[in-house]
């Protein structure tokens, strides 16, 4: 068996087989259901409807619509409850619902009913599969994907406990086993068994046929099976298409013989445009390259790179296989000539010419040119030292010597072409052709120039004049031309198509593969990129294979694979880029080993950056080490130190540091570094850059423009964001990323329809662009076009089922449709796929606008409005993480994984019913029996999710106890200020005076009472979603006064702006009086009855048994704007306060404020702000006599505070602490003792007047109390502030404990509180 073909396909086969394994119900089972239904229809009886119902149940299980699956299963159970197939689906349903114990019971029953049946075996396999660790399975799959087939097979066997594989994993297991030569026969037998057991399992049929094609002895049988599979396009379209691709690939492996030629001709009849197969038939390669050919090819590549020792070794290896190999002999002659050994070079050339006279012309110029080889050797030394100017001067002089014009000019032209002087090189090639129109080297050189410029037709015309002896070189030039054409287009779909054509022509060319892989990554198809690179990563044959593999794995951030490939590459084969990577790997390894021994990495960073860094590799290495650990703080520090060590940075340094700055999301620093380079042409600022440097510069500039635009868009400044993006839109109208950024700007301004037009236009241009598809799905949801969003998402999943982004788009659509469980399933699928990708890279390798209108950039800034526009100074975004010596987990190191995990956790909690219980305490300052308040409550809250977690219904009941303490009955100041105790004390004074004058008086004094405790429970029902909240409830039932409470708030969001409008009726909880009301102790006393009898209905209408229980009817509006990390808000409102037997009041209030993020890392944040507040009441009711409300109600209140918030989390612990300090000024008017009763107020006035006339120093009532019947006003200015803290700890996914405390000083009161609460998710979704 040819291992080369096995490794080239193993990754693709494994990826396709994994798709079935991660489905909740394996695809093979759905196919079995379809087959069973077909057979049932033929047999008739009760089996047919039963099989149809079972097929429906399996379909709904696959769609994760479990209610529908249960209904279909129950209907089937009514027909035949003990039928083996019914029991099998019953077990599958129980497994999908997570009820493994029930599924195990079902399996035992099934084994009793039908022992050894297919149904029993299938259900047993399913239960075994579900017991396998997902993490272990992902690790084994990553081993297989990286080409470590033997290790992967051992891993699978460990998962299977040495037994046979579960049905859903059998195909991928045997496919992986087929990659181990010693196990190929066993793999074939295993797949043959699967096919025999179920001929309609098309995935097994495909895998079996493909495995047969890998071995020359069974290749024709595999071809026949692949051809048969192509006929099942209706039943199995995916497998049929894959079979066609495998069939075509296998044809290219076959020699052209009488047996194989008809097969190839049949294919060409159906596919007349397959030029590669035509070429294969005309010029059959004779099978895979022999070892001598590979060694010879490597020798010439090494020779062209100046690595003479490696080239000599390669040519000698080829000659050991075939000592008469003319090309290898000639290669040795070239090596000897460059080494300065003229005699040895002459001997090798002569032997080469004698070995193959037909190719003797290749070596005659070299033999003739040996006389001046010293000059050419000197030129080559200059080129190797990058002294291009001196080399060109020597070549120009050399061309003037007799007989040297052609050779020197061609060498000069080649040098000019490779250093980017395309026009000059074209002129030199043409000068050679002017003297010698058929000069083969000049024709090929000029063709390379035309290919590089995109002039494909002209290049091919030149190549048509090249003789067949240069067929290999001509093929390389055509491939180079295709690669140049690909580099000249920013259309990712066209670029991929061009590079696929190039790979068809040069399947083993590593540079074609890496360019195609990079193009696929830019298109978003990371999995396919890995499959393209897999052959050279798993089995690198040449040094160039390793070089390309190193560049690919380095770009993917896979340091382990990069080091592995480097270990097999000789330092002589290092290119400048590879040498830079090798140095970076060494720096990282050394620094990482020392980090574990120090508590502070800063000294090590400075030490590592002390040596010179001419290419920027050292600074990038140090910064990238910390970036990979999630430590952005020290990554930024390393880059800052590296980029400021010298004033005059080289272009290489600027490009390297800027690239790393972009990796850590700091486009501002990257732009600052690139500014001195200008446009790279040298016409303006900066020197001229090499072509590769110019390309890197352009890519960085585009990325910076997009990043800065997104940053400003987050801040809500779409106008300035467009100003940053417009140059990128103009520079490359075909580029995708600026267009998608423009769509995000429209989304940010609330113009979702316009954003959708742009996203759809990009998607029509390149349907494989998953980033564009994701954006289109979100824009469609934002525009209210949910059906379109679902259609786009489903297309993405069908086209790219192994890409996490496709499932993220599906999650957006499903959530918009209210399918919460399906949304979680989509997110979990995306998480698993992304995790596999990350672990794999770590361990190994209305009518819409027209497309033109949507894609065209606006002629002017559409986000710049008249009279609006502010210039925002861009600052570096604050990112980073705390230093840790431990390597980060995949989730912590990968932004997509972290985001998906957060979405899953949030949605899981939103979908799960929950119950909360707690115990809270509150204490408010004031006089005993009046303003002082102590409260204890036990809130019990239940929450039911609605609409896929987008909404919820919350029920709560809160037992509440409040008390104010006992009134100080001996206080001459407190007693008259409570209820109607002023009358009581006046009466008692009268009785005492009368008793002194008449000892026989029968009148008795009344008892002073005051201060009450109350208890009750407060019910409430609340509905809420993202933009509306409404509730209805009551103040505690059991208090003297109970009020119906409730409210509604609307909070629609338009772009970065949120509008809040609310209307609510709430209790004022400042005191026992305002919260629950009080009963006047005098109402039923003898004095009270006397007063009511004496004053009759007039007093009865002004005096009741209870007063208080105040509610505020509040109407409020607010606007909030989120501008990046800053939140601005402002609003105002009006309220009316009413209570039982209390004076009505009204309030006006307004406030503005802002807060901004001043620091954050991966786990913590700090925000600081400022808040300005005003409110004022019509009258002052902050007192406790009858008719007063007992709540703080100044006539004007102003405050300015500075709040600071610190929040964070660490593992299971999270916290949120806010503190504020400020200054307040408020003014209170005077207020009558009894504002609702003219009789009581006139009595109070009479008592006050009488006191002023008759009081003595020993009187019970003090002058301070009754000098007038009004409470005095006041004006106060003082500090204000407080804090609010919460600490939570999550014991399990379902259970969380919260502790909170607060203290506040405001107005004329202080308040403190504490609570302990438990949050429990009843069902873990």
Curated annotation (Swiss-Prot):
Signal peptide: 1-30
Subcellular location(s) of the protein: Cell outer membrane
Keyword Signal set for record: yes
Transmembrane segments: none
Start-end of each TPR repeat: 50-83, 85-117, 292-325, 326-359, 406-439, 558-591, 702-735, 737-769
GO CC term (a single one): cell outer membrane
Residue numbers spanned by region Disordered: 838-886
GO biological process terms held by the UniProt record: cellulose biosynthetic process; UDP-alpha-D-glucose metabolic process
This protein's UniProt keywords: Cell outer membrane, Cellulose biosynthesis, Membrane, Repeat, Signal, TPR repeat
Pathway: Glycan metabolism; bacterial cellulose biosynthesis
Cysteine disulfide partners in this protein: none
Broad class of the protein's primary localization: membrane
Membrane topology: Peripheral membrane protein
Domain of life assignment: Bacteria
InterPro entries: BCSC_C, Cell_synth_C, CellSynth/LPSAsmb/PSIAsmb, TPR-like_helical_dom_sf, TPR_rpt
Protein function: Required for maximal bacterial cellulose synthesis. It may be involved in the formation of a membrane complex for extrusion of the cellulose product.
UniProt xrefs under PANTHER family: LIPOPOLYSACCHARIDE ASSEMBLY PROTEIN B, TPR REPEAT-CONTAINING PROTEIN PA4667
Family: Belongs to the AcsC/BcsC family.
Protein name stated in the entry: Cellulose synthase 1 operon protein C
